[in-house]
């Protein structure tokens, strides 16, 4: 099934086969974003003179034109599939006198390049956002901002959020009636979106942080190696540290990532805070981490510049682990195709619907340097062994998610399953069914 957006200064998308996607999408109602909401979107993303803004599904071009006219953006680009909207956008840009700094591209936002964007605006719908987010994270530079109107990014919580309420006569008849009950907008919650409330959200594209990092630390007895094992679920981070020496010191790490700006703290699990701790504030550039490291030991703090390097990682190949029912093995094949990391989920033992079992491409896959993260939607079927993964996507459908880092010629992380209905919620912290995950590589 293919997804393509039509109107980003408004909203439209369709779950339609790509062969007839254009004709289907052109029948979806176009609703422009209110000007007060546009201003708040720009404020939330802090759009300024150095920014290049892309509106994916740009409609009549209102957001694109306003970005350069009102915020002084260096450039703004709209991608829109409807040729009539493209013509309207170009006429409006000419009237506004901004044709030298705007561009309107007729095409599919899933295939067009937007890698130069520092700000991306979306008004597409929950499912379209989920289909698009892997490309956003893969394509945009760390620190780029993604802003959305009304719809979220699943289990990826926003970095900032704003609720806008504005008196607007006629809102009930014009907007709500067109979206409510529209099969092309199944995630539109009519009760929540009535009246004049808009929810605006922003995400900062994270740098690829996952992996094993090593660097020397100057201590009273000489230099000691500090090893970090950092796991990454988009902007969700966790890990551990080991300070090696005559006696190794080990503990857990909590971290916060803002683009390529990283802060982390390390604590011991069995000793008081004032006895030992580490704190870091710095930046990531490819496979190098640089910044200021503070070491707290027996109430004494030492600060110094610190640099660490990430271990090389190779997680290509087919990985095997026991499925959710009994000891039946399932597989995840990870490979790079046309420059993009993808996975194939294989369950040869599941055969109630297909002779070859379940096989599906995992497109929501993220290469985070020394580790990876993935999610995909699967069904559930009941059998004598309990609940197993199946191909039916029904009321029992859910998301299989996994993350791991390359370590000791293998990978180590967690794998989780949780119901489909829970993914849009923003308060999910611990996913249901999460368990340690150390799959075996069965083919290189």
Task: Write out the residue ranges for each language-model feature.
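Conserved SAM-binding motif I beta-strand of class I
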Residues: 75-80
């Amino acid at each position: 099934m293919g997804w393509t957006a039509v109107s980003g200064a408004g909203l439209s998308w369709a779950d339609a086969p790509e062969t007839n996607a254009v004709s289907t999408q052109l029948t979806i109602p176009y609703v422009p974003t209110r000007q007060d909401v546009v201003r708040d979107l720009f404020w939330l993303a802090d759009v300024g003179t150095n920014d290049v803004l892309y509106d994916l599904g740009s409609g009549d071009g209102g957001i694109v034109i306003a970005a350069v006219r009102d915020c002084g953006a260096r450039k703004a680009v709209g991608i829109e599939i409807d040729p009539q909207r493209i013509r309207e956008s170009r006429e409006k840009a000419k009237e506004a006198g901004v044709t030298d700094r705007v561009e309107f591209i007729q095409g599919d936002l899933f295939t067009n390049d937007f890698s130069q964007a520092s700000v991306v605006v979306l008004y597409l719908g929950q499912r379209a956002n989920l289909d698009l987010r892997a490309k956003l994270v893969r394509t945009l530079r760390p620190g780029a901002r993604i802003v959305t109107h009304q719809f979220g990014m699943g289990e990826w919580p926003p970095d900032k959020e704003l609720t806008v309420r504005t008196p607007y006569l006629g809102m009930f008849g014009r907007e709500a009636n067109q979206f409510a009950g529209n099969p092309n907008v199944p995630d539109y919650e009519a009760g929540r979106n009535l009246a004049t409330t808009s929810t605006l959200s922003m995400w900062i594209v994270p740098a690829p942080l996952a992996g094993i990092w090593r660097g020397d630390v100057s201590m009273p007895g000489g230099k000691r190696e500090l090893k970090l094992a950092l796991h990454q679920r988009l902007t969700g981070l966790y890990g551990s540290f080991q300070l090696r020496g005559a006696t190794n010191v080990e503990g857990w790490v909590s971290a916060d990532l803002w683009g390529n700006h990283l802060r982390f703290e390390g604590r011991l699990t069995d000793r008081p805070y004032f006895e030992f701790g580490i704190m870091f504030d710095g930046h990531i550039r490819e496979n190098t981490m640089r910044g200021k490291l503070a070491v707290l030991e027996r109430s004494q703090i030492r600060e110094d510049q610190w640099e660490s390097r990430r271990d090389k990682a190779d997680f290509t190949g087919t990985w095997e682990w026991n499925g959710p029912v009994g000891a039946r093995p399932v597989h995840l094949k990870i490979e790079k195709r046309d420059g993009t990391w993808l996975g194939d989920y294989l369950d040869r033992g599941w055969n109630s619907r297909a002779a070859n079992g379940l096989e599906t491409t995992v497109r929501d896959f993220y290469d985070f340097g020394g580790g990876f993260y993935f999610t995909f939607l699967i069904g559930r079927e009941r059998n004598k062994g309990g609940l197993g993964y199946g191909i039916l996507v029904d009321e029992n459908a859910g998301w299989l998610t996994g993350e791991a880092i390359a370590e000791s010629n293998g990978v180590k992380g967690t794998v989780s399953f949780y119901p489909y209905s829970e993914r849009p919620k923003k308060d999910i912290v611990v996913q249901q069914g999460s368990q340690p995950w150390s799959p075996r590589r069965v083919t290189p």
